């Protein structure tokens, strides 16, 4: 797909570091199981952002799977030139992202580990070198990472990106 090749054609590095910042109560096995999936999410986000604008600076993703609605709900914010943009992600990237997120949850279930109800993934593009952070929340109400329909989710995304 064209958005997948966006970073390759520009020769950008896809160096990522998947880290779970909220490790209390999460087993090492569950954290290790999440790292490859977090890296895949980072790759999808970075390629999708590069397909929209080559010199993007930050991307934030929040995903909710609270059971009240079918599937996984996602919210993505792209920061470019100091401004935030919503609704930017190509449909193909959204589909790929949802597949990765569903496989991540399925793997945690297979391991009989707590499955995240909410997830934050932030990525910073520093001249083609990527830094990332992921935070999983397994409390049923999604906590600080609940996507609010009909409200601005920008402050939540910016809070997750702070200090990254």
Please identify what each model-predicted range represents.
Residues 3-4, 25-34, 41-42:
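Leucine-rich tandem repeat or coiled-coil scaffolds
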Residues 5-28:
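Long, intrinsically disordered low-complexity tandem-repeat segments
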């Amino acid at each position: 797909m064209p958005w997948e090749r966006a970073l390759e054609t520009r020769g950008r590095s896809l160096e990522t570091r998947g880290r779970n910042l909220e490790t209390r109560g999460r087993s090492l096995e569950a954290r290790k199981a999440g790292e490859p999936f977090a890296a895949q999410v980072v790759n999808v986000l970075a390629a999708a952002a590069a397909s929209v604008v080559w010199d993007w600076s930050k991307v934030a993703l929040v995903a909710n799977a609270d059971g009240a609605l079918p599937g996984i709900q996602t919210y993505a914010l792209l920061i470019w030139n100091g401004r935030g943009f919503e609704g930017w992600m190509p449909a193909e990237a959204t589909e790929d992202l949802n597949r990765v997120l569903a496989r991540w949850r399925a793997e945690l279930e297979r391991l009989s580990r707590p499955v995240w109800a909410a997830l934050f993934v932030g990525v910073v593009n520093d001249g083609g070198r990527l830094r990332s952070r992921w935070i999983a929340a397994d409390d049923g109400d999604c906590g600080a990472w609940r996507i609010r329909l009909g409200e601005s989710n920008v402050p939540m995304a910016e809070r997750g990106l702070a200090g990254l």
